[in-house]
Amino acid sequence: MSLREITQKAEAKMKKSVESFQHEIAAIRTGKATTALLDHVKVDAYGQTMPLKQIGNVGVQDAHTLMVQVWDKSMVAATEKAIRDANLGLNPVAEGQSIRVSIPPLNEERRKEYVKLTKKYGEDAKIALRNLRREMLHGADKLEKDKEIGEDAKANCKKDADNLVHKYEKQISDMIVQKEKEIMEV
């Protein structure tokens, strides 16, 4: 494997780490209704556990209400139970083939918990980036040991790794600040 391939592979994994972090924090409640809130909800349907997205459509009705349109009427009760049991602090109400999910306002204590959770996810993502950096440098060490690259190329690889980690850590930090602002907004 060449130095370029090692760098490209590491950068692709770093991008995935940032995307994964973005997906995780999208599911953290803010004061507003967002469909991402129900992304992780799994419904017991047809003898298996399925994501809510495969059971029906989720839409935002207004700033504090989500509406779930269930495709199969027999799945309304199971879907309502799954939302209630998802530990999101939501109380869904079935209305025919739809389920109305009111998003209650967050109290100060809950907001602080969500900010702390966001920061924890951010720190986990940053740790993943640093591990990928270590992996990248290990690959460069191996190439140098096998006499495929020189010290200068290895030093450049280290510089590239540091720049990549810095770039993606900044993206994560910016996302944390933005999410914190959304959570604390009353």
Curated annotation (Swiss-Prot):
Record-linked HAMAP family: RRF
Gene3D superfamilies in UniProt: 3.30.1360.40, Ribosome-recycling factor
Gene Ontology terms for molecular function: ribosomal large subunit binding
Keyword Cytoplasm: yes
Chief location: cytoplasm
GO terms of biological process kind: cytoplasmic translational termination
InterPro entries per record: Ribosome_recyc_fac (IPR002661), Ribosome_recyc_fac_dom (IPR023584), RRF_sf (IPR036191)
Protein name per its UniProtKB record: Ribosome-recycling factor
Family: Belongs to the RRF family.
Superkingdom, taxonomy of origin: Bacteria
Record's subcellular location: Cytoplasm
GO cellular component: cytosol
The keyword Transcription belongs to this UniProt entry's keyword annotation: no
Record keywords: Cytoplasm, Protein biosynthesis
Gene for this chain: frr
Function: Responsible for the release of ribosomes from messenger RNA at the termination of protein biosynthesis. May increase the efficiency of translation by recycling ribosomes from one round of translation to another.
PANTHER family, A to Z: MITOCHONDRIAL RIBOSOME RECYCLING FACTOR PSEUDO 1, RIBOSOME RECYCLING FACTOR
